[in-house]
Amino acid sequence: MERKDLTKLQAFALEEMLEGKNVFLTGGAGTGKSEVIKMFIADREKAGKNILITAPTGTAADILGGETIHRAFGAPVGVIANSKPVKKREEVLQATDIIVIDEISMCRFDLFEFIAKMIEFENGERARERMQEEIGIHLEEPAKPEIQMIVLGDFYQLPPVLTKEDKATLEEIYHYDFGEGFAFRSVYWDMFDFEPINLTEIVRQDNAAFKKVLSYIRLAKEKEMCTSFLQSHSSTFPFSTEDAIFLSGLNNKVSELNEKKLSELPGKTKTFHADQDGDIKMSEKFAEDVLHLKEGCKVMFTINALSGEFKNGTMGTVMRMQDNCILIRTADGNIVELHRYKKEITKPTVKETVKNIKEMDAEGNIQVKKRL
């Protein structure tokens, strides 16, 4: 996508971010949030800015080529207490110009506060350095402006994980109403003075009536009209579910159905195991550790191929399998020879001689990246 292809709201969001404003970019699925942020990142990187790209999970971080929030900021897993003050600057943040957090709805408020306190301390040190410059004190390096914060996601879609046990513990620690645990419930949310920009035009779907219904469903509005619309598009004739796609909001239900369908296919099951080294957290994994396949089973790719042979969401059928190679026929008839995909889980570090964010290999994770 090029700038000329952006909608008015998308173009406005891009310009506001390029002007250096802190932005909360939101909108329903298919409104182009990721496309806009990719343009912004490309532009700022070309301008020599250091961008720390993060997301709550490995899968979300992988989309923008970033790392998980926990790894980027060294955040602990689980409930985070709010009592520990920040006493020193983090080297990575000293080199950072812009922080991008994708899927902000999945970032729980206590994790957001952990991040915000680190940024607040860093920005305070930068303000002190700018003041020193103004009164003529020589600094080894020019003082920097505050870190620009860009957060994007949809609070109507994916909530943060908040178990009963965690909620009970958090209520003892945080003495304010954090509701469902969303990041905007944090007392630090307003510190960034985000400009909220809501993308409203669905660009991934051309059917105007369907787009309208999708928007209503997202906002839980016009329930009777939406129900009537969906029912009018359901079949009144007997039909086979043999090749139908089943949707579920629960991973265990999906796994049960996949196992059932796989067992119904003839032939032997071939099992692929992920090869991994180092300390990799569960939230940083972007695919299952074990994958069971048979010839004839249907799969869906969950990454984009650099070659363009397939993209996230491409459907296909397994034709043949070897230990390190799988032959897949995509839905449009193309044959893809799939080999093991290597994903390096990295953490940001800074070299003393060059104040640039560098990526240091932390752990390797080699997986066959597709899903039944």
List the model feature ranges, each with a label.
Residues 1-372:
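Conserved ATP-binding/catalytic motifs of P-loop helicase motor domains
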